[in-house]
From Swiss-Prot:
Record-linked InterPro entries: MFS_dom, MFS_ERD6/Tret1-like, MFS_sugar_transport-like, MFS_trans_sf, MFS_Trehalose_Transporter, Sugar/inositol_transpt, Sugar_transporter_CS
Signal sequence, start to end: none
Domain of life: Eukaryota
GO cellular component: plasma membrane
Name of the protein in question: Facilitated trehalose transporter Tret1-2 homolog
Cystine crosslinks: none
Annotated GO MF terms: sugar transmembrane transporter activity
Chief location of this protein within or outside the cell: membrane
Chain ranges passing through the membrane: 29-49, 73-93, 106-126, 130-150, 161-181, 185-205, 269-289, 306-326, 333-353, 373-393, 403-423, 434-454
Family, per entry: Belongs to the major facilitator superfamily. Sugar transporter (TC 2.A.1.1) family. Trehalose transporter subfamily.
One Pfam family of this chain: Sugar_tr
Length: 488
């Protein structure tokens, strides 16, 4: 799944080398929780098709026909709409503000779910899914920008985990509820989830950086006071923000989107695009969107709805494992582990479905698909899930980070659409085994891409990474591992 955890797309940070240790102020926790509740909604709607399509295509439950082709569009139209939303979200967060843009998605999220819940034909469902996807695309840009501009660097890693965690909770909620709700009732639940997010977003302020960008120094000061605490001295931070904005304005006048295609910038852009390609063509969103259908086709001896719940739980806990390990093992080691796990499990899944279709009998191995799915999700969530987004924010040069990240984000959503829309067609043309083997071959190519092209960025500042990516100093492609500390 691509729950939509996007890196810092339209903003670059100026972080002092030294500074006071940040505290987990209640206001910062509240701000992070408020926007992360939007991520919970995103997780829920992204996973919706997995449990919903089974009852949606059942004529004893649904009063109108949903063909297999229409079902593929129910899954595929959301990422296509998210691509459009992602492109639209960039200008919106600049002109309306980060908070206002996020807040503006709440009501459409509710309306889109109600449109699906009350649908009397496939067109209404598709319209609801398109509106849902459009909001998801906007959220995918605006959530990380808001958090990046409001949280202090010392707590950004911990509180920045909340969107990923709540997004995975949203997936799990959808799987659990989908085990006993039909598609219509599940959509009604989806309409209720944005309400807490809507209420909390009204309470929190706009980001100080956006106020500074608009020349509203006093409002920026008030927002910083709210976020840092009334007793905090916010003047040094405000001064840094104003200086950073002045430098960004100066660069914006000198550089255009044509900078993206200069040879010196193509290397980091190509690496980021490559990581996004291999992330999506590992087949993750096909797995998330069609989990129930896959287990049903596999003839697993374990209830398909229970299988999806187990997959959701694994996805949730694997996220925390990745966070704990990424600054210990480094990016490349986790990408290696991730790729190898996906290659092995996709190969075995392909073999299982081949034997199921052509023999020998594998009915006694009904537990095998679930085992492979668990390891596959675990591997993806450790590496190729979060790291492409993290590295997008690390390796793209500051002066092109905004437009470059928009290109990378749009490309990711395009790949998501292609995978989710064509998965069922692939299973018809090649068989389920052929589809899984194809994803496995892509993962093998992705492994070589990581070995040869992807730099190790652990422990390096953004400035150091940029100097190396620009070729001013050589960059190492060799992994480096930080020893574990057992101090409590």
């Amino acid at each position: 799944m691509k729950i939509l955890m996007r890196a810092d797309t339209h903003v670059s940070y100026s972080v002092p080398a030294e500074g006071p240790k940040a505290n987990f102020t209640f206001s910062q926790v509240l701000a992070a929780l408020s926007v992360s509740l939007c991520s919970l909604v995103v997780g829920f709607v992204s996973a919706y098709t997995s449990p919903a399509l089974v009852s949606m295509t059942d004529r004893t439950i649904t009063s109108f026909e949903v063909t297999k082709d229409a079902g593929s569009w129910v899954g595929g139209i959301m990422p296509l709409a998210a691509l459009a939303g992602g492109i639209t979200g960039g200008p919106l967060i600049e002109y309306l503000g980060r908070r206002t843009t996020i807040l503006a998605t709440a009501v459409p999220f509710i309306v889109s779910s109600l449109l699906i819940a009350c649908a009397v034909n496939v067109i209404m469902i598709l319209c609801g899914r398109f509106l849902t996807g459009f909001c998801v695309g906007i959220a995918s840009l605006s959530l990380p920008v808001y958090l990046g501009e409001t949280l202090q660097p010392e707590v950004r890693g911990t509180l920045g985990l909340l969107p990923t965690a709540l997004g995975n909770i949203g997936i799990l909620v959808c799987y659990v509820a989908g085990s006993f709700m039909n598609w219509s009732m599940l959509a009604f639940l989806g309409a209720a989830l944005p309400v807490p997010f809507l209420i909390l977003m009204i309470i929190i302020p706009e980001t100080p950086r956006w106020f500074v960008n608009r020349g509203q120094e006093e409002r920026a000061r008030k927002a910083l006071k709210w976020l840092r605490g009334k007793e905090a001295d916010v003047e040094p931070e405000l001064k840094d923000l104003m200086q950073s904005q002045a430098e960004a304005d100066s660069q914006a006048r000198r550089n255009t989107c044509l900078e993206l295609f200069k040879r010196i910038n193509l290397k980091p852009l190509s690496i980021s695009l490559g990581l996004m390609f291999f992330q999506q063509f590992s087949g993750i969103n096909a797995v998330i969107f069609y989990t129930v259908q896959i287990f049903k086709d596999a003839g697993s001896t374990i209830d398909s709805n229970l299988c999806t719940i187990i997959v959701g739980i694994v996805n949730f806990f694997a996220t925390f494992m990745g966070i704990l390990l990424i600054d210990r093992l480094g990016r490349k080691i986790l990408l290696y582990i991730s790729d190898i796990a996906m290659i092995l499990t996709l190969s075995i899944l392909g073999g299982f479905f081949y034997c199921k279709a052509h023999g020998p009998d594998v009915s006694h191995l009904g537990w095998l698909p679930l085992t492979c799915f668990v390891i596959y999700i675990l591997g993806f969530s450790l590496g190729f899930g979060p790291i492409p987004w993290l590295m997008m924010g690390e390796i793209l040069p500051a002066k092109i980070r905004g437009p470059a990240a928009s290109v990378v984000t749009a490309f990711n959503w395009f790949c998501t659409f292609v995978v989710t829309k064509t998965f069922q067609d692939l299973t018809v043309a090649m068989g389920a085994h052929g589809a899984f083997w194809l994803f496995g071959v892509v993962c093998i190519v992705g492994l070589f891409f990581v070995i040869i092209c992807v730099p190790e960025t652990r422990g390096k500042s953004l400035e150091e990474i940029e100097r190396k990516m620009m070729g001013r100093v050589p960059i190492s492609a060799v992994v480096n591992i930080k020893p574990f500390s057992f101090n409590m």
